[in-house]
Amino acid sequence: MASKAAPSCRLVFCLLISATVLRPGLGWYTVNSAYGDTIIMPCRVDVPQNLMFGKWKYEKPDGSPVFIAFRSSTKKSVQYDDVPEYKDRLNLSENYTLSISNAKISDEKRFVCMLVTEDDVFEAPTVVKVFKQPSKPEIVSKAPFLETDKLKKLGECISKDSYPDGNITWYRNGKVLQALEGAVVIIFRKQMDSVTQLYTMTSSLEYKTTKADIQMPFTCSVTYYGPSGQKTVYSEQAVFDIYYPTEQVTIQVLPSKNAIKEGDNITLKCLGNGNPPPEEFLFYLPGQPEGIRSSNTYTLTDVKRNATGDYKCSLVDKKSMIASAAITVHYLDLSLNPSGEVTKQIGDALPVSCTISASRNATVVWMKDNVKLRSSPSFSSLHYQDAGNYVCETALQEVEGLKKRESLTLIVEGKPQIKMTKKTDPSGLSKTIICHVEGFPKPAIQWTITGSGSVINQTEESPYINGRYYSKIIISPEENVTLTCTAENQLERTVNSLNVSAISIPEHDEADEISDENKEKVNDQAKLIVGIVVGLLLAALVAGVVYWLYMKKSKTASKHVNKDLGNMEENKKLEENNHKTEA
């Protein structure tokens, strides 16, 4: 009995000693685990053949041991100690590997695997490190706007539930922001939850912005340590509205200042290039030193030509920052004299003037009965064809809608004028009698036979054009007759007669009246003939001059030749006389 008790005593003593003293030479082993994962700790001791059982313990901060798991090598049974924080979380395998589910920060301890034989205790320590990835950093408490040249809190970067704690870095357009006195102020804080032991990191950024920061993205990141090493997580980008003062004022004129005409409404719009743009301005009208306070627009209604001038606007609190625009209110006046309906007598003179007054050169177009005229009408002696509806129209091409027009309806009146002609048909069986009538209003024509007073109704009339038309009858008189043509309008009654011989008696035919159109053709032909004659005369004159010059030159040459021949004759005679004398 005594011999059996001795080994048991030695075993208990060894367990007590090993609970406080780690056997040297086994070294340290670290297991890294992510928060919430299962911690797996192999027992790094070779299992001896005479193993009795294995145990796991951990050490408190004061070094005292806490046993948590036991496994017998003979009974193949597992027992877990009543440790509240590890209840239902432990699993000890046959090879004495200890697994702890749902890893927590409090699991960061030194665990020891103990394999016990009758003679010895073998131990292997394992250090557990638990890591918790922080939440994605977020920029919160963001400033609604930043102001240039003012140090202002931009926002806070926050990342939660980290273990161990991490570092926060700020970036502007992807580049790290370093603290700079008076321009970049970064304050970092961290806080640990007493229950979860997880850290929350917060970094606030105060920043003095410039206009270069417009549309620039700001981000932050958290750098932390995980089971596999160091990692970095970035926040979403944040872009801030940058407020900056107005540096320039501009003025706009609506509609376009090149197309303003009398009667238009003008809207002046003043703009500042600051952010936010100014909401109020002072507007200065031509000749008014005091500005009118208004929003960024000021409207003038039904403007007149005297509104032409320089318009200005400025900031309310900085009147020296001013902008101006020159505005011309275009106008167009037209005066037609005479105008309306005018009645004149044929042969009268009628001066017509269309006077234009405009803000710039205007185009003038004359129309007669909707047909464009080549030049302004001028009437020194009115004709019936001058009657019609005349329109003087003017416009400013650069200003849409600015045009004026006045009309003149000219009526040319005249008493009836009659001319009668007769012509025998080539067959000799009939005669054509024509009564040409001129006058306005249109005269009525009546044919009668003098003596009998009979009225001839079978007539043929031409169209009434330019105050003229004719009435024609065809007769075959067996005896001499006198025909009377009567033309009558509101002005007068005119009568003319023509003697017509019997069809059997030959007589001289009278030429037909030449129409206005034929007159123009005759005039054109006459002009052409005159031009040809003048051209021929000029050609003959030039030819005569050339011939005269030629003849004059020829006579001069003949004189020189005759003179030379005379001199030769005289010299010959002198030589002959000299020979005779010598003989």
Swiss-Prot record:
Disulfide-bonded cysteines: 43-113, 157-220, 270-313, 354-392, 435-485
Keywords associated with the record: Adaptive immunity, Cell adhesion, Cell membrane, Cell projection, Disulfide bond, Glycoprotein, Immunity, Immunoglobulin domain, Membrane, Repeat, Signal, Transmembrane, Transmembrane helix
Signal peptide: 1-27
GO biological process: adaptive immune response; axon extension involved in axon guidance; cell adhesion; heterophilic cell-cell adhesion via plasma membrane cell adhesion molecules; neuron projection extension; retinal ganglion cell axon guidance
UniProt-listed InterPro entries: CD80_C2-set, Ig-like_dom, Ig-like_dom_sf, Ig-like_fold, Ig_sub, Ig_sub2, Surface_Rcpt/Adhesion_Mol
TM segment ranges: 528-549
Intervals, Cytoplasmic compartment: 550-583
Post-translational modification: Glycosylated.
Identification of the protein by name: CD166 antigen
Organism phylogeny: Eukaryota, Metazoa, Chordata, Craniata, Vertebrata
